Every structure is written in C-alpha cells, then in structure tokens.
Amino acid sequence: MKRREVLPLIAGAAGIVAGAKVVAAEKSPAAPELRRVSYQSARTGKERDYFVYLPPGHAQKKDWPVMLFLHGDGERGDGKGELDYVLTHGPLFEAWCQNRDLPFIIISPQLPMFDRGNQPYIKMRTPASIPARRAEGINPRPNTVTGDVRLSEPMGGKSPDDRLPDGPRGLTQGWYEIEDELIAMVDRTVASFKGDPKRVCLTGLSYGGFGCWYLAAHHADKFAAVAPIVGYGHPDHAAPIAAAKLPLWVFAGGRDPVVPLRYFYPVLNRLEALGHPEVRFTNHEDLGHFTWVRVYEGEDLYAWFLRQSRA
C-alpha cells in the first residue's frame, strides 16, 4: 500500500517544507509503516528525504516515544536514491529490516556526502548491500549488559588522553553541519505523528556517536536520554549535559582501532567531576568498531530509553 500526504513542515532556520510518502506498509491498520518525508535542505540547497518509522499499532494510541538515529560515515548520501543505505545498521535496521517490534517512532535522516565520497567504504558499497525486510519478525532479543553500569568509581586511572584529535564539533563534515535541520525533523515528527515531546531519545554510531555528543550539548533540553556508540565527546560538552542532568549511556569497543578507548575518558571524567547523576559507560572489551551491532541487537538499551522522560 502506498499513498502520499502533504505535511506542512516549516521550521525556522532549517527552512524545511516537507511531504510524507508511505514507502511500505502492510494492509492491517495496526502494522508498522516506513515513510519518506521530503524537505528542502538549507545546508545543501536541495530537496532531501529522511525516514520516519511508525511502530505497530501507531494509529491506536498517542504520545509515542521518539528516537532520532544518526548513522555512521559510510551511510552518507543524497537523501534521495541513496537514502536506503541508512537501513544498513542501527535501530531502523532492527525495527524495519528485521521486522522487530520496537515501540518507538524512529527518525532516520541521511548526512550529506559533502566531499567524503572517495572514502573506500563508500566507493565499495552497492545497492546489493541494502538489507531487505524479513517476511516474519524475529524473537525478542536478550540483554547484552549485566550488572550496574553506572559510574561507580573515579576513572582517572583509566589512561585518559586529554590530547583529543578533534575539537568540540567532532569529526569534520559531521552531523553539526545540519544541526538545525535535525531539530526541525524532531519537532515536526512529534507534532505530526503523535510523538511525546518529553520522551525524545537520541542515539548514533561512529560519526553518529560524535553527532550525539554535539547535539546533546547544544540541545540538552530537547532529549530525554542519549546513547552515543563508538563515538566520544569533548570535555566542553560536559557542562551543559551535566546542568540538564541529561541521562547518558555511552558505549565503546575495547578493540576498536578506529575510535580508541582512551579518548572516551576526558569527557566522562569531566561529567563525573561535575556530579552528573546519570552517566553509564559500557566497554565491550571483546569488540572492535562494530560494537553497535551487539548494542542495537540487545533489548537493554531500548528498555532503558523507555524508562526515560524529561520533567
């Protein structure tokens, strides 16, 4: 079933005007839907699309929790024919491609390519790498973390490295480039699809993990919880996050050669020094950069998100 509806989406500096098209849906009104929402990007000057996933039973209730997902460097694209690459990893892969019942509205935008199209992992990708949707849903997944993962002891002995290779904006040509557009997407999705503005969570992997820290620091009052995966923050991010008491669950891979573990500690130590009451840090010591596969496969991150709400 496919249909098109016009959503008046006008949002400040982002200058967004959008429509939404059902990409795919089952005939049952209780079935999940995947929609493409069009907007005019102020940053690129072109029309682009982003995905909005609506969970099973969406039409029967309101005040759904909302999740903004920021992908990694390898899923960049033109926001049109290349948008499907954002289905490759993360919560949208789990909810849509794996046909998994995740009770969130999921917003999944695509970062523009800018001049990073020559990266080997981008040049090597093909449409064949885009996963198809499973005909039948998967069984509930297990938790991936056990025990209390809140910071319980000083981390100064964890080999912190205060000489970070990146400034507060994170990696070059990252998600900060479309900051206003991302916030506009959240606001419009909440207004148009029965989202709960007090339960908007943020997560991302690699480049998206860096983007999570940036958005959390600059829009701490927007989110109920944030989970950056294999992306570290800058110590300058700590003060606004701590002031807002924004819950964080940070994930790293102990064998990650791309985003070294030692770079996570400066911001975590700063948050601890500021007395932030809700910081979790999980290091999957046996995993490398693809730590996000285990994290997003598990149930515990989603269960934690569902417990969070802004006052």
Regions found by a protein language model. Name each.
Residues L70-H71, A252:
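The conserved beta1-alpha1 loop
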Residues M1-A13:
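N-terminal secretory signal peptides and thylakoid transit peptides that target proteins
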Residues E181-P197:
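Conserved acidic catalytic loop of the alpha/beta-hydrolase fold
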Residues K245-A252:
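Catalytic His-Asp charge-relay segment
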Residues F251, P257-A311:
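C-terminal catalytic histidine-bearing segment of alpha/beta-hydrolase fold enzymes
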Residues A14, G19-V66, G74, F104, ...:
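A domain-start/cap signature at the N-terminus of enzymes
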Residues K198-P240:
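Primarily recognizes the serine-hydrolase "nucleophile elbow" in alpha/beta-hydrolase
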Residues E75-E179:
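Active-site machinery of serine-nucleophile hydrolases
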